[in-house]
Amino acid sequence: MLDIAMPKIEVVTAAENYGRFKIEPLDPGYGHTLGNALRRVLLSSIPGAAITKIKIDGVFHEFSTISGIKEDVTEIVLNIKGVRLRSYAERPVKISLSKRGSGIVRAADIDAPSNVEIVNPFHYICTIDRDDAMLEMEMTVERGRGYLPADQRDALPIGEIPIDAIFTPVPKVNYVVENIRVGQATDFDSLLIEIWTDGTIKPGDALSHAAQVLVQYSQTIADFNRLSTETESTAAPNGLAIPADIYDTPIEELDLSTRTYNCLKRADITKVGQVLEMDEKALLSVRNLGQKSMEEIRDKLIERGYIPRIGQTTNSSPAGIES
């Protein structure tokens, strides 16, 4: 394979929510190849956090009005979408807002736990225009990628209002490709990429993350020949095979209780296959995981068909846990 000259990266401008980066020299054509790929990943695949649903005391749907509040619920929902935050929690987190008396309500009035940080505290939410009025609101913060419309969410209980979730922390990316001279050649590329963020991530970190995403996909293709010759299943201690797609399923898919989930995570058990490899004795040896949690795990595995139900026999059950 012919060697490809590695480019250098120069930070032209660096701020909290804006950055310009120059990548050069690139072989002819690679400016647009890299620029377009990085731009697409930056706009769609950088993880972020957003408020996904709200619940306001005395409000049952988004077309309501609130006594003593200048804005109607639809306007409040639109303003809530603009609250930008960092979430360090893997699971949904509840935050709340409680304010009494006339005045402007801003994002700074939101009461959030230590694992959630409001990045734009001066963001306007609504105005209370009566001294005896009160606004009580509960919001759910989740992590995700891209954009999740409210109408693609599962049905919520009456009173909970879904919000279009804008997870992406990168709203805008531009790139320009120019020709530069390298030795006697004048057709090499120089890539200048501009990145705007919402302040929850630095532009340089976003660029690095986007490149890592591209590397992961490219590595899968690069390893194709090696992976195609390897076995597609892993053997459990009981001698039964665990298909690769089941083995690599995240334990989040089991929808376990918070206590059980945290016990497994602290033990560095992150995949369904790891659970299936363990017998009951091994599971019970996990710190703080008791009989009740073990039974919950077994029920979830049965529910999803990973192990057979009692009385059902199969020669291909992948589980190490007996049912």
Curated annotation (Swiss-Prot):
InterPro entries xrefs: DNA-dir_RNA_pol_insert, DNA-dir_RNA_pol_RpoA/D/Rpb3, DNA-dir_RpoA, RBP11-like, RNAP_asu_C, RNApol_insert_sf
Q: Per its UniProt entry, what is the enzyme's top EC class, as one word?
A: transferase
Residue numbers spanned by region Alpha C-terminal domain (alpha-CTD) = 243-323
Which keywords are on file for this protein? DNA-directed RNA polymerase, Nucleotidyltransferase, Transcription, Transferase
Where do the segments described as Alpha N-terminal domain (alpha-NTD) lie? 1-225
Pfam families associated with the record: RNA_pol_A_bac, RNA_pol_A_CTD, RNA_pol_L
Under Enzyme Commission nomenclature, its number is 2.7.7.6
User: Which reactions is this enzyme annotated as catalysing?
Assistant: RNA(n) + a ribonucleoside 5'-triphosphate = RNA(n+1) + diphosphate
Which CDD domains does the record associate with it?
Answer: RNAP_alpha_NTD
Q: Does the keyword Transferase apply?
A: yes
Gene Ontology CC: one annotated term: DNA-directed RNA polymerase complex
NCBIfam families xref list: PRK05182.1-2, PRK05182.2-5, rpoA
Recorded hits in HAMAP family, A to Z, give: RNApol_bact_RpoA
Family, as annotated: Belongs to the RNA polymerase alpha chain family.
Q: What does this protein do?
A: DNA-dependent RNA polymerase catalyzes the transcription of DNA into RNA using the four ribonucleoside triphosphates as substrates.
What is its quaternary makeup?
Homodimer. The RNAP catalytic core consists of 2 alpha, 1 beta, 1 beta' and 1 omega subunit. When a sigma factor is associated with the core the holoenzyme is formed, which can initiate transcription.
Could you tell me what this protein is called?
DNA-directed RNA polymerase subunit alpha
UniProt source species: Roseiflexus castenholzii (strain DSM 13941 / HLO8)
Organism taxonomic ancestry:
Bacteria, Bacillati, Chloroflexota, Chloroflexia, Chloroflexales
Q: Which gene encodes it?
A: rpoA
